[in-house]
Amino acid sequence: MNPLILIMIMLTVILGTTIVMMSSHWLMIWMGFEMNMLAVIPLLMKQYNPRSMEAATKYFLTQATASMLLMLAIIINLLYSGQWTFTKLMNPTASIIMTLAMAMKMGLAPLHFWVPEVTQGISLSSGLILLTWQKLAPLSVLYVISPGINLDLILLMSMMSIAIGGWGGLNQTQLRKILAYSSIAHMGWMASILAFNPTMTLLNLLLYILMTTTTFMLFMATSATTTLSLSHMWNKMPLITSSTLTIMLSLGGLPPLVGFLPKWMIIQELTKNNNITLATLMAITALLNLFFYMRLTYATSLTMFPTMNNMKIKWQFNNKKQMKYLPMLIILSTITLPLAPAITLLN
């Protein structure tokens, strides 16, 4: 892709998300979503092949449907309130429809089916944008309408997302699909605490973006897209591969890595709000995510996949790819929690 065109597309993506996050007018928010969607589609088709075309088409159809639901919710709210600006108390019907629209844009269950398929069909760099930046705008809208959100609906969707994010990743060997299901589960954790403590949702989002960005950058550095290709990297890049596996365990929420912090704080907050049953179910279901990450770590580090005897060994050479920011990102994604014990005192 022409660098000038790429810069223009990236600026449009950033502008669309910024309009959504900074506007107080519903029509401007809808326009921001549309700008963002139309600019992201060329990024998804950066590698021009049938799979990326299919992924971009699925993404467009899903996001267009969500935008129609968003406009329907805006019109219903306009009929009841008589104004285009944000109101703290939305009409219940409009609130439910808007929650469903944002859930479809984010990939919350049961509106999640497009996330693994689209992520698998695009490049790693496009997948990074899809699973990190594209979550900001829908979550900002949910953050604003959180005082009037339907509690039963959002908790049901969050519990389903955590369960499906765990079950879906169990039989996957494609790393992009594993990260897509992990994203669905993390979105479920964020949605579960949204009605009780929206600020904690932002903390969870920050840590999720940090860990996912580091994981994608490590995959881009090793050019790994499957479990098999990751296991063959031990000879070529041992340090990078071990860092990748450590960050995957952090994504799964293994203490004392930083991925454990948001889960710990969310369970604590849910318990304070007398949602003990939900917190218990979420904690048990989160073990599914941790299981497939630990299985992936075990398979790539302690065992050898069945391969042909005449397969060429990957020798270790100096890596030509620039990785200036990776050491800092790896440190932040793994040992932030042990280095900052004061975080555990936050209420």
Swiss-Prot record:
Catalytic activity reported: a ubiquinone + NADH + 5 H(+)(in) = a ubiquinol + NAD(+) + 4 H(+)(out)
Molecular function GO labels: NADH dehydrogenase (ubiquinone) activity
Pfam families xref list: NADH_dehy_S2_C (PF06444), Proton_antipo_M (PF00361)
One of the GO biological process terms: mitochondrial respiratory chain complex I assembly
GO cellular component, one term: mitochondrial inner membrane
Subcellular location(s) of the protein: Mitochondrion inner membrane
The EC number(s) this enzyme carries: 7.1.1.2
Entry annotated with the keyword Transmembrane: yes
Broad class of the protein's primary localization: mitochondrion
Record's keyword annotation contains Mitochondrion: yes
Keywords: Electron transport, Membrane, Mitochondrion, Mitochondrion inner membrane, NAD, Respiratory chain, Translocase, Transmembrane, Transmembrane helix, Transport, Ubiquinone
Membrane topology: Multi-pass membrane protein
Transmembrane segments: 3-23, 25-45, 59-79, 96-116, 148-170, 178-198, 200-220, 247-267, 276-296, 326-346
Function: Core subunit of the mitochondrial membrane respiratory chain NADH dehydrogenase (Complex I) which catalyzes electron transfer from NADH through the respiratory chain, using ubiquinone as an electron acceptor. Essential for the catalytic activity and assembly of complex I.
UniProt-listed PANTHER family: NADH-UBIQUINONE OXIDOREDUCTASE CHAIN 2
Quaternary context: Core subunit of respiratory chain NADH dehydrogenase (Complex I) which is composed of 45 different subunits. Interacts with TMEM242.
Membership in a protein family: Belongs to the complex I subunit 2 family.
Entry protein name: NADH-ubiquinone oxidoreductase chain 2
Organism of derivation: Saccopteryx leptura (Lesser sac-winged bat)
Organism ancestry: Eukaryota, Metazoa, Chordata, Craniata, Vertebrata
Gene for this chain: MT-ND2
